[in-house]
């Protein structure tokens, strides 16, 4: 397991990804609603969607050996080693606007994205 601290990034060593306060707070709320403090948010990339890859979000109680973890505001984010390579430098956020509310990934590695925002290619 690889852990990513909540330390600020330096110019020489950028953080591998950003888990915003807004996203962490929403996940914390959802975990409280589930009533299981052992839940962690797993973010992953899988084949599919109209652009070749798509993002997925699920709750998981287990941390796998190849997972990278990040703790923010008491919430643990998990990313497996295969997905990690596609998410390096990405920002995982939660947005609420007139169109609704959703988790959003801003990924600098994506060369194209689908209109739905959940599918991308590299």
UniProtKB/Swiss-Prot annotation:
InterPro entries to which the protein is assigned, alphabetical: FeS_biogenesis, FeS_cluster_insertion, FeS_cluster_insertion_CS, FeS_cluster_insertion_RrpA, HesB-like_dom_sf
A Pfam entry, by short name: Fe-S_biosyn
Keyword Metal-binding: yes
GO molecular function, one term: 4 iron, 4 sulfur cluster binding
UniProt family annotation: Belongs to the HesB/IscA family.
HAMAP family noted in UniProt: Fe_S_insert_ErpA
Oligomer and partners: Homodimer.
Protein name: Putative iron-sulfur cluster insertion protein ErpA
Organism phylogeny: Bacteria, Pseudomonadati, Pseudomonadota, Betaproteobacteria, Burkholderiales
């Amino acid at each position: 397991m690889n852990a990513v601290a909540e330390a600020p990034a330096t110019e020489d060593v950028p953080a591998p990804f950003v888990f915003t306060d807004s996203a962490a707070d929403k996940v914390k709320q959802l975990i409280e609603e589930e009533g299981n403090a052992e839940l962690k948010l797993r973010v992953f990339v899988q084949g599919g969607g109209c652009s070749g890859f798509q993002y997925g979000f699920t709750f998981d109680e287990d941390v796998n050996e190849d997972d990278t973890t990040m703790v923010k505001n008491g919430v643990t984010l998990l990313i497996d080693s295969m997905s990690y390579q596609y998410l390096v430098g990405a920002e995982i956020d939660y947005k609420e606007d007139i169109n609704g509310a959703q988790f959003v990934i801003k990924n600098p590695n994506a060369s194209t994205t689908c209109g739905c925002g959940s599918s991308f290619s590299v």
